[in-house]
């Protein structure tokens, strides 16, 4: 049979069917998103034994072989949470070491989320897994592949590739990793990252930079002599050798492939094409070579053109030097998908070559090279030797995916390429004889399940059920019959007849209408018949209650009853409420009952806990009066559903839950899942766009019935977490339950929380962000203020200002003032602005200076602050604040107040403040321990600066700080004899610091003594503060520290100095004094030294260029001074 007689078909695999749970998951994904499916085109796959489907946060896996005597029950496994789209490329299903009931290996599953969270099941029968957070350097996981099967007690090993091109090796961790599934992650190879700074520098200064590479779109491993990993990105094709490990070779698209693509365009245009651009799409091994799919564009075409190139088997050992074979892939169908302006075509094409096809030297009995797109599939049939193409004509075939169907995923197996579709199931892509495939299977319609539908076709069934509800729960009076008929006519879209039927009721008072509607609705939600399925009955109640709300709204009844007084029974006690409370309660009771039923049927543990709960609920007097015996019959009584969460919370009491840890956590999880499910269902029902919006009244039914049990459960979870008996995974899970459960309690509560205890406990347990989110949502101002007081000033003040606007109606501003004053945070209180804060602060005398500043009475504020600074003897930070503010206020005073005393005080105390700040933290810790804010006197600062230091450099800097302090003080008090004595005492300490008996020469004095090094510091070292370009200590000030009588100082020294030592010291000081005199004559500009670290790259370059100029300028001044001194002599 010639190739022309072949056609590409989708051959249905009847032996593979989707289980009911998987179909339900598909339906849930559809209905959950308002007529938009959440099912992606990369969520399903299969292998020779199993199929699997990703659905939201779970994965379904089942055997391919269909059983004739029992239904297919898939295994459901939870997936790690992810904020990025999932892909089956990151799922590996393999044969594990465990044996099932039929003695066949149970599959193991490895799942990695895009963020790098790994879950590993060594056997799906155990339902236990290992979870690891892989260190993949904040990259996104792209693909995971199995490298080695589990053997000899070692776990299976895998290769993980990220979108950045990094390859990680996942291998077993521990001696028994085959059973535990523990894995460890090690980086094997990857592309070199090119930082932003290098590229920016290259742009600004013209340096050469490597061509940036784009994200990896696909990768795969190939086992030959070595284990190779091929990564494909639009710009680069890279091959890594895992055994080395290293990069084997890399080919850039622009340099290697683009010229070949340009030759095709040149042949078509008969001239050189312009703006040719090629992008790699995918690659696969074919006949030992490498087949590559490439997309190309040029200026004169608005479409993306497809090409295939093949490189010989040499690619496995060395970098290819050229393309062996290449061809254009015609894409004549679906041309709109290949528009040049839409780049999605590059990511939606996948190259699929089954193993047998890839290894076959001939194309006979193969299906060719398959290219898959969500809308079509293409086969390229190559019946010739690619290395020696005698007949280079290839066969191209195309098949479309059914228009009403959706691609779920694909699988490349040994023989075929499988595709999994939403409606049509599983098919293979086959090149079959023309007419062989029967396409009639694609024309069938989905069967509508009446119990689960909400359309017009289900109304006859719902109408029949409604009649049973009304007949069993209401008296046969004309009013109820009229309401029933009116609603029936409304549901059948006979609006005029419905309004006519309702006239008698419309004439009644609003309160009476509310009573009739209430009884009608309660007759619906409290109906129960053992002959009906519970889920079908609950769904019918939900549909009917929703439609009744629309009915009431459309007929003008809703507005009349929503505010009407209405008596509602609560445990046999009649409470006066309004019609709106009743309408919301009815709908939410049905939603809560549905949530409880879903929870009960989800797993066996929940069912067992439910039985224990129901046994206690049935003993409640209100329930006993109904004579219910069947446990499931309680679901038909939605009016009693509030007892279930209350009794469920009681199951967590210590005398009930039991002492076994495993059983205790099972009950904890079951109860928390129940409460979370009720909460989520009620909240989602309130937010449903299709229902009539009912305002929530202050006293809601949930608060009166069961909301308090949510707080009880949250407190029990916190108590359990404090015990410390839970594992990390259990702890994380319980914390997530608290967020959901306590959020519902706060939303239902009628009082505003303040510094809520549970929220504070959540912060202490490591969930500050979530706790703050709840506090902000529910207006717990105490928790908000307490938490943000621990943040930096900028963040704190911006947040407070935002809260003032957000909670303006709740008077957050005054709450903040009261809180700050009560907790002694006057510093933060003074940062607040506004007229209301000003009025508040006027009531407190201790904050007088702040008011004086606010009122621009700067002179008075300066005197107040000066007295505070003078009285401060404990806190240095407060002293600095008071002193600085006093000076600024004095400088800003324009009210005529005499502030000379303040300025003189600042002048006298400023040196103390300045030099106290320069003392290193290490010295302060030695002095005061952790109290780094302690005040220090001048004597203390001198003593600790001159203390023994760990090295000579630190000692010199310490003496420099001491002398600098004395110099600044002497500049303020030039006639102070006491300061001069302290200078002499400091010189004496400097000389006594060294062991002079080891000094043998004058050079030793300069190089080996602290005295000599300090003298050298005086003339050669001019450090500046960070960000300043001038020294902190100028030569003219350094001259002030010279002793008045050096002979007296040396005579009082206790150091073991000889006559030579004394002469060397005197000579050295004389020479230093001369040098400082010369330097003092230099202008200030001669000491200009810019801080290179505080300027940008361009400024730095400019300043570095001016550096030699400044140095020559300084040297010119020095030479001039030397010449002048020589002339004088």
UniProtKB/Swiss-Prot annotation:
Its main location: nucleus. It comes from the Eukaryota. The keyword Lyase does not apply. Signal peptide: none annotated. Keywords: Developmental protein, mRNA transport, Nuclear pore complex, Nucleus, Protein transport, Translocation, Transport. GO terms for biological process: poly(A)+ mRNA export from nucleus; protein import into nucleus; transcription-dependent tethering of RNA polymerase II gene DNA at nuclear periphery. It is found in: Nucleus envelope; Nucleus, Nuclear pore complex. InterPro entries: Nucleoporin_Nup133/Nup155_N, Nup133-like, WD40/YVTN_repeat-like_dom_sf. One of its GO terms (molecular function) is structural constituent of nuclear pore. GO terms for cellular component: kinetochore; nuclear membrane; nuclear pore; nuclear pore outer ring. Important for early nematode development. Belongs to the nucleoporin Nup133 family. PANTHER family: NUCLEAR PORE COMPLEX PROTEIN NUP133. This is Nuclear pore complex protein 15. It comes from Caenorhabditis elegans. The gene is npp-15.
């Amino acid at each position: 049979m010639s190739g022309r007689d072949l056609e590409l078909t989708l051959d249905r695999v009847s032996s593979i069917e989707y289980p009911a749970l998987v179909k339900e998951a598909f339906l849930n994904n559809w209905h959950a998103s308002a007529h938009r499916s959440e099912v992606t085109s990369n969520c399903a796959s299969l292998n020779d034994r199993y199929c699997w489907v990703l659905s939201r946060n779970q994965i379904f896996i089942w055997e391919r072989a269909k059983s004739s005597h029992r239904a297919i029950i898939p295994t459901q496994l939870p997936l790690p949470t992810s904020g990025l789209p999932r892909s089956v490329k990151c799922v590996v299903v393999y044969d594990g070491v465990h044996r099932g009931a039929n003695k066949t290996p149970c599959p193991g599953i490895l799942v990695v989320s895009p963020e790098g969270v790994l879950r590993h099941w060594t056997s799906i029968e155990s339902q236990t897994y290992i979870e690891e957070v892989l260190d993949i350097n904040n990259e996104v996981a792209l693909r995971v592949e199995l490298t080695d099967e589990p053997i000899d007690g070692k776990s299976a090993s895998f290769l993980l590739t990220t979108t950045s091109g990094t390859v990680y090796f996942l291998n077993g961790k521990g001696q028994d990793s085959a059973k535990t599934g523990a894995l460890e992650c090690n980086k094997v190879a990857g592309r070199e990252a090119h930082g932003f700074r290098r590229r920016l520098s290259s742009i600004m200064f013209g340096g050469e930079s490597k061509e940036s590479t784009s994200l990896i779109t696909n990768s795969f491993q190939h086992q030959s002599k070595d284990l190779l990993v091929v990564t494909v990105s639009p710009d680069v094709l890279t091959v890594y050798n895992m055994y080395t490990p290293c990069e084997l070779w890399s080919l850039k698209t622009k340099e290697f492939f683009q010229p070949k693509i340009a030759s095709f365009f040149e042949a078509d245009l008969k001239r050189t094409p312009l703006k040719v651009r090629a992008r790699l799409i995918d690659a696969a091994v074919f006949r030992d070579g490498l087949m590559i799919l490439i997309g190309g564009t040029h200026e004169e075409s608005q479409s993306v053109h497809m090409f295939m190139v093949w490189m010989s088997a040499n690619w496995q050992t060395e970098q290819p030097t050229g393309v062996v074979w290449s061809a254009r892939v015609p894409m004549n169908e679906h041309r709109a998908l290949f528009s040049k302006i839409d780049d999605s075509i590059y990511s939606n094409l996948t190259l699929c070559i089954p193993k047998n096809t890839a290894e076959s030297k001939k194309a006979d009995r193969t299906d060719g090279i398959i290219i898959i797109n969500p809308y079509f599939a293409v086969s390229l049939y190559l019946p010739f030797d690619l290395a020696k193409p005698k007949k280079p004509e290839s066969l191209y075939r195309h098949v479309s995916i059914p228009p009403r169907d959706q691609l779920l995923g694909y699988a490349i197996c040994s023989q075929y390429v499988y595709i999994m579709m939403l409606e049509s199931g599983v098919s293979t892509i086959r090149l079959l004889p023309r007419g062989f495939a029967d396409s009639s299977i694609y024309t069938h319609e989905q069967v509508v399940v009446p119990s689960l539908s909400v359309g017009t076709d289900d109304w006859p069934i719902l109408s029949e059920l409604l009649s049973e509800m009304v007949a069993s729960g209401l008296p046969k009076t004309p009013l109820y019959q009229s309401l029933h008929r009116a609603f029936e006519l409304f549901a059948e879209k006979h609006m005029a007849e419905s309004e006519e039927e309702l006239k008698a009721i419309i004439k009644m008072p609003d309160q009476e209408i509310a009573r009739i509607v209430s009884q009608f609705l309660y007759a619906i939600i409290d109906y129960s018949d053992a002959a009906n399925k519970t889920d079908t009955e609950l769904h019918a109640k939900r549909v009917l209650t929703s439609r009744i709300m629309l009915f009431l709204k459309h007929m003008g009844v809703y507005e009349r009853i929503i505010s009407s007084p209405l008596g509602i029974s609560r445990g046999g006690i009649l409470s006066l409420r309004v019609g709106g409370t009743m309408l919301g309660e009815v709908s939410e009771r049905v939603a809560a009952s549905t949530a409880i039923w879903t929870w009960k049927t989800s797993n066996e543990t929940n069912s067992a806990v439910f039985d224990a709960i129901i046994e206690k609920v049935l003993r409640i007097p209100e329930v006993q009066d109904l004579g219910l015996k069947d446990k499931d019959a309680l679901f038909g009584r939605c009016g009693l559903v509030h007892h279930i969460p209350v009794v469920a919370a009681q199951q967590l009491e210590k005398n009930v839950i039991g002492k076994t840890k495993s059983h205790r956590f099972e009950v904890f999880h079951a109860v928390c899942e129940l409460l979370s499910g009720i909460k989520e269902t009620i909240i989602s029902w309130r937010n449903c766009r299709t229902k009539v919006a009912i305002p929530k009244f202050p006293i809601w039914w949930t608060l009166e019935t069961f909301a308090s049990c949510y707080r009880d459960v949250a407190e029990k979870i916190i108590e359990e977490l404090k015990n410390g008996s839970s594992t990390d995974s259990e702890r994380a899970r319980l914390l997530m339950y608290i967020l959901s459960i306590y959020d519902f309690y706060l939303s239902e509560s009628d009082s505003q929380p303040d510094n809520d205890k549970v929220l504070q406990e959540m912060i202490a347990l490591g969930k500050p962000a979530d706790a703050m989110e709840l506090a902000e949502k529910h207006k717990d101002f105490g928790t908000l203020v307490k938490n943000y007081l621990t943040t930096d000033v900028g963040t704190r003040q911006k947040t407070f200002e935002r809260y003032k606007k957000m909670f303006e109606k709740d008077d957050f501003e005054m709450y903040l003032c009261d809180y700050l004053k009560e907790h002694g945070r006057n510093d933060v209180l003074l940062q607040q602005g506004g007229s209301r804060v000003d009025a508040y602060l006027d009531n407190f005398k201790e904050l007088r200076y702040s008011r004086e500043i606010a009122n621009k009475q700067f002179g008075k504020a300066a005197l107040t602050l000066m007295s505070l600074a003078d009285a401060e003897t404990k806190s240095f930070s407060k002293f600095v604040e008071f002193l600085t503010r006093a000076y600024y206020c004095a400088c800003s005073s324009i009210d005529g107040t005499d502030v000379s005393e303040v300025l003189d005080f600042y002048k006298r105390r400023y040196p103390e403040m300045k030099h106290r700040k320069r003392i290193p933290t290490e010295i302060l810790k030695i002095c005061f321990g952790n109290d780094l804010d302690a005040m220090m006197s001048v004597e203390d600062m001198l003593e600790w600066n001159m203390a023994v230091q760990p090295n000579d450099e630190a000692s010199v800097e310490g003496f420099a700080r001491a002398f600098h302090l004395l110099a600044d003080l002497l500049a303020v008090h030039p006639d102070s004899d006491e300061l001069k004595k302290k200078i002499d005492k400091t010189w004496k300490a400097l000389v006594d610091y060294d062991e002079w008996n080891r000094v043998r020469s004058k050079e030793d004095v300069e190089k080996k003594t602290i005295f000599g090094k300090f003298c050298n510091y005086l003339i050669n070292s001019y450090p500046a503060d960070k960000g300043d370009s001038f020294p902190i200590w100028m030569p003219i000030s350094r001259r002030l520290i010279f002793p008045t009588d050096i002979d007296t100082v040396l005579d009082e020294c206790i150091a073991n100095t000889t006559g030579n030592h004394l002469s060397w010291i005197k000579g050295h000081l004389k020479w230093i004094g001369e040098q400082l005199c010369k330097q003092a004559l230099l202008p200030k500009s001669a000491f200009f030294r810019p801080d290179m670290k505080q300027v940008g790259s361009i400024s730095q370059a400019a300043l570095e260029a001016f550096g030699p100029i400044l140095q020559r300028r300084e040297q010119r001044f020095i030479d001039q001074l030397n010449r002048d001194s020589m002339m004088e002599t």
